[in-house]
Amino acid sequence: MEIWLLILASLSGSLLLHLLLRRRNSSSPPLPPDPNFLPFLGTLQWLREGLGGLESYLRSVHHRLGPIVTLRITSRPAIFVADRSLTHEALVLNGAVYADRPPPAVISKIVDEHNISSGSYGATWRLLRRNITSEILHPSRVRSYSHARHWVLEILFERFRNHGGEEPIVLIHHLHYAMFALLVLMCFGDKLDEKQIKEVEFIQRLQLLSLTKFNIFNIWPKFTKLILRKRWQEFLQIRRQQRDVLLPLIRARRKIVEERKRSEQEDKKDYVQSYVDTLLDLELPEENRKLNEEDIMNLCSEFLTAGTDTTATALQWIMANLVKYPEIQERLHEEIKSVVGEEAKEVEEEDVEKMPYLKAVVLEGLRRHPPGHFLLPHSVTEDTVLGGYKVPKNGTINFMVAEIGRDPVEWEEPMAFKPERFMGEEEAVDLTGSRGIKMMPFGAGRRICPGIGLAMLHLEYYVANMVREFQWKEVQGHEVDLTEKLEFTVVMKHPLKALAVPRRCH
């Protein structure tokens, strides 16, 4: 305890001196208001409450001080924005200035180096993002994975039918496995068996849920590694396990690609390009070298995590509301029947484009329950002004997704689940935010999630098919509880338990 008090006192003293020196320059705009007179109080708040508790604290701070505030969580001031107009001004109208990320911390340098979500804004980042958007997430490429989506749908339905309509289903377990199986196929190009999929899923999940525990090494790493040696060794052990699981899959795919090149196979009928395929020959422009195995592993890990957790979490929230409000579920079912009829085997991907209420249900789920309540932190490339306040060069700025999507000025009864709010609008809500931000579950501007189209397809396709095939009912004694809990994404504190009653005889 004495060590931590010494750390905080030293940090506070340096920050206080820094503040006093800055205030001598009265010509520049001030930083956004800080609720804490003493800088170290922001650090204490973060250490005590974590990111989950920080959100409710920020909500009260914004209510008192306005839509843009400063907290000193580390030695750098962190700015938080909870206003859609200011967010649009920053991310869209002034996007190039706000497109960078804060310098990578110790943990990030190991698990996130050369990735898309956390990489610095520059030539390498542009190359990696262009690669995934053109080679994997382009609409023509997305269509080529339709067989994989159908395969995963069959896995889900088989699991649901095994419960017989009378045994409660903990939905998130099945959704997470199914989405992970789909992303593994897209990443490595093969349908792995259940044992292999679960092995990859386990190590990815272990790394993901442990990151918050390891974030302590980002604060004075030489010191924290010394006093928390066992925890540091635990982190390194997880990385070794990840290499043991992922590298054989990457090497196997490399071998397949090289054999195809040697044999000059022209028949592409049964060949579907995987994410790994696109990475093997990429050359980093800033280092004049190809991606090494560690780089490829990190990019594959990012791909699996980004495409699995957010989608599975969003699916659970949407299905929870359909169970809680059966009248919404039945209206959706009627729309599905009117489009595909009674005899169709499943709802095809082309069918969902004809279902406006389905889209409204998905959009309302993303508005009311965005999987991420904050965008990943942005960093500015030069001194700039936002809302009359200074955002200093290299300063960290955070945008509050959930608060913007629940703004009572924009949304009537923002905490209610009302899909009809997206029906009959003269101008549909622009999820990209380019015309204005009303909600931004995928971010906005130059750092918008590149998988937005794929995610929307997955959400609409799987919700439509689950509702068409099963009637989802509340389990007696287990009322749907929409209380939130922060993990990697914001999940249901009490996971959804429901009955899946088949609607049709097979």
From Swiss-Prot:
Bilayer-spanning residue ranges: 1-21
Gene3D superfamilies given in the database record: Cytochrome P450 (1.10.630.10)
Keywords, comma-separated and alphabetical: Heme, Iron, Membrane, Metal-binding, Monooxygenase, Oxidoreductase, Transmembrane, Transmembrane helix
Subcellular location: Membrane
One Pfam assignment: p450
Cofactor: heme
InterPro entries in the record: Cyt_P450, Cyt_P450_CS, Cyt_P450_E_grp-I, Cyt_P450_sf, Plant_metabolite_P450s
Gene Ontology MF terms in the entry: heme binding; iron ion binding; monooxygenase activity; oxidoreductase activity, acting on paired donors, with incorporation or reduction of molecular oxygen
Annotated binding of heme, by residue: 449
Enzyme Commission identifier(s): 1.14.-.-
Family statement: Belongs to the cytochrome P450 family.
UniProt xrefs under PANTHER family: CYTOCHROME P450 89A2-RELATED, FLAVONOID 3'-MONOOXYGENASE-RELATED
Name of the protein this chain belongs to: Cytochrome P450 89A2
Organism for this UniProt entry: Arabidopsis thaliana
